[in-house]
């Protein structure tokens, strides 16, 4: 990529398929995306954030074994119309050590 696109080697960041979108920030930080952006913008590079609370959230999300089933009755067929509801239920499940399985009811 660096040879054909005139991009510095340290600015090539691999966007991998991950099990969850919530793992993307940790993956990008591990590859140095934050440092590369600050360097390109001419900003001072300080201490790398530890992302402790974020990693704790991921650990809780990944270790949850109990499942709670929720039926969601909605007006629209397109499930994206209920994205915020799905995400908020998912977050609530994570903080209560549960995986949330949502069944859409038409």
Segments (PLM) and residue ranges:
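N-terminal beta1-alpha1 cap of cysteine-dependent amidohydrolase-like domains
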Residues: 1-106
């Amino acid at each position: 990529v660096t040879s054909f696109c005139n991009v510095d080697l340290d600015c090539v960041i691999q966007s991998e398929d991950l099990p969850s979108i919530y793992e993307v920030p940790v993956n990008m930080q591990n590859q140095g995306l934050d440092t590369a952006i600050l360097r390109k913008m001419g900003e001072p590079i300080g201490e790398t954030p530890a992302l402790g609370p974020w990693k704790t959230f991921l650990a809780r999300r990944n270790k949850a074994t109990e499942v709670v089933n929720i039926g969601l009755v909605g007006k629209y067929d397109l499930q994206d119309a209920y994205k915020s509801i799905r995400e908020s239920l998912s977050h609530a499940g994570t903080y209560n050590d549960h995986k949330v399985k949502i069944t859409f009811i038409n």
